[in-house]
Amino acid sequence: MELIGMVLVAVITALVGPAGLEYVKAKLSKSTSKDIVKDDIERNLVIFDEISEIRETLNADRIWISQFHNGGHFLHTNKSIQKFSITYEDVKPGIGSIIHLFTDIPLSLYSRAMNHIMENRYLWIPDFKDETVATCGLKSAAEATGTNATYAIGLFDIVTDKCIGTMGIDYRTKKKLTQVQKDFLIERGSRLAGYLSIYLKSK
C-alpha cells in the first residue's frame, strides 16, 4: 500500500503540479469515518465547493461535471451500453438546472463532441449561433437548455489517462474566454480529475 501511495503522489505531481498535489493531499488527508454515507457526502461537498468557485471566478451561468458509466446491455448481446450522467452541477441564481435532463444518456448521442474532447482534451464553443464555429452536434442540446456558449474539458484518470468524464461551463449569451481563463479552467479541471480518480478508486 505504501508503494501505491508513493506512485500516486508521483503521478499527481507530474500531472497537476505541486499546487495541485498539495490541494489533493489536503482534501484526502481528512480522517474518514466508518460511515460510508457521511464520507460520501463530505467528499461530494469538496467537489461542489470546487466547481462553485470555478463558476464564480469565470462568471459562468452554469458549471457541470458528467461521468461515464455502464447502462445495461443490448438485447441480443452481452455488450454493455456506454452512458453518461451529469453528477455535479452549480448554477447562478435564476438559472435553471439541467442535471435531471442528462441522466443515463447513451454516449452514442454525443459521439462527435466526445471524440473531439478525447482527441483535443477540450471543446470551446464561444457562440452556438455563429455558423463558422464547430458545435460537434451540441446545438440542439444548447437550444434546449438556453445555452449560447460552452467551454468543456475532458477529465482524465491520473494513472491510466483514460477519460472518465467531462466538465463544462455554460453561458446564456455568447462568451469569448481569454487564454488565461481557459488555462485556469484546464488547471482546475486537472485538479478535479485527480481528486475524482482517487475518490472513485477508494469506493
Where are these regions (language model features)?
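A structural signal for short coil/turn segments at secondary-structure junctions
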Residues: 58, 145-146
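Intrinsically disordered, low-complexity terminal regulatory regions
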Residues: 4-98, 202-203
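Juxtadomain coupling helices with adjacent low-complexity linkers
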Residues: 163-203
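Well-ordered, non-membrane alpha-helical segments in soluble/globular domains
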Residues: 43-50, 107-111, 186
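A short, aliphatic-rich beta-strand micro-motif
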Residues: 149-157
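Regulatory sensory and allosteric helical modules in signal-transduction proteins
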Residues: 83-145
